[in-house]
Amino acid sequence: MYFWRGYYFGKEGIWCQDFDKEEAFCVLKDSLYKDYMVRAVADNGKTIAVSRNIGTNEPLLMVDVDKKTIKNTISNHTFIYPCLDREGSKVFSVTKSDIYKNIYGNPFCVDAETGKVIATLDEKTQWGNTAYHPESNSVYFSAFKQPNLYKFNFDTLAFSAVSTDKKIRIFDCKVACDNKGYYYLGSNILVYMNNEDEEVWRINFKEKEKLSGKTLFSICLSDNPDYIAVYLLDGNWLFIVNRNDFSYKKYKLGRVGFSEFFNNSLLFIYKNDNFSTLNLETLEEKPFLPTAGAIL
């Protein structure tokens, strides 16, 4: 299931494409929400969080996907890389940082119904991405360009630190599609950890590719258990890594907004909300549109 903002079938709004079904459907089609974007999706697929802007204290709207209605609005918080718990009842977020003014915030969790803060990490720094782990109902998150990785459990509301390689300045972290582990990336090194927070393997791209002056900064994981994709900071190259033997293919990419895998392809979202897919076996790229039928 994939959510996006766009103009399709004569309607602009928040759309959903369930890849197990033939039809896309519009979750929010009112013109009032044309500038809103999807910020987080509950693991059960029944709740999404949307807002107008990233990095401001704009209200976060909690949307019931089945009923296509807004069930609650959370105000007075700045949500950066928010994550929803399994049922969409709690929202975790790192906070906005201004490194030039030495202003940093505390990661926190709020009750999605009341908007009340129910957990806070007493540590302030510049925070990186978040990654939801469905099996443990937890969130992994990193301190940006630092060797620090943390875990927040939605059930216990407890924070914990994860032991990592202190020589790696972390850019990104992602949970494996099979929920058997997770990845973190930094200093041009990709590390795979199991659910016991133990390192299983790593790939040092700097040694293999001589990435002088370039930085790998983002990970994208496939529903197919064989593939990982890693981006260069300048957006020009994509490395498609085979999890089984650590071999990889390179693809001349060009800059994209963001992307994710589905089936055996990588779905790109370019500027102006144009879609395309890249086949991981053939490296064939072609335009992508939702199915011809739609439920408005």
Whereabouts are the PLM-identified features?
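A short beta-strand motif characteristic of beta-propeller blades
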Residues: 23-30, 69-74, 116-121, 158-165, ...
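Solenoidal tandem-repeat scaffolds enriched in leucines and small polar residues
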Residues: 94-108, 119-134, 139-150, 154
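Short loop/turn segments that connect beta-strands within beta-propeller blades
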Residues: 18-22, 64-68, 111-115, 153-157, ...
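Blade-level signature of beta-propeller repeat domains, shared across WD40, Kelch, NHL, RCC1
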Residues: 260-296
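A short loop-to-beta-strand structural motif that recurs across blades of beta-propeller domains
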Residues: 13-15, 59-61, 106-108, 148-150, ...
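Loop/turn-rich, solvent-exposed surfaces of beta-rich toroidal or solenoidal domains
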Residues: 213-236
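Repeated scaffold domains used in trafficking and secretory/extracellular systems
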Residues: 34-41, 77-86, 125-133, 168-178, ...
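Beta-strand C-termini and the immediately following turn/loop, strongest in propeller blades
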Residues: 2-8, 28, 41, 49-55, ...
